[in-house]
Amino acid sequence: MKNKTIITALTVIIASLITYFFVSIKKEYPQLYNIENDVISSVNKVNGLKIIPKIETLEDGKIKILTFNKVSNSISNAVKYANYLWKNEGYYIITNNNFGKENGKVELAKNSSENGKILKVNVNCYTNDSFSVVISLINGSLLLKNNISNN
């Protein structure tokens, strides 16, 4: 009887320790997205989201589609991410189609570290608590014009 009690107590302690270690293991969320030689801050880094997106990689890694599902306040998370890229990482807003509203989207771009390439980011808001980020490396370059004239 005494041996049975000791074995039961040890089993409970071991099971508790195993459960504690599995529960306390932190998931690693990406801090950066890589597209060839370029890096972009991740949504997880910018917004602190604890969601791992569905990731599709196309065109030999030159296009990444990240879909974030079951995100509360998905529109505000999408806006926060796009604003961060614009204000902190040197992206320019190329198009804005009702961004910040359901089914809205924004396209941002900047010159890649690779000559003759553009890094383009599309952030799309959806209606069902989700949003997507499409990152692509395309041929071209941004030529920015100063609209201020000196008269």
Where are the regions that the model predicts?
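An acidic-aromatic pocket/loop used at catalytic or ligand-binding sites
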Residues: 2-6, 17-151
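Sec-dependent N-terminal signal peptides
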Residues: 7-13
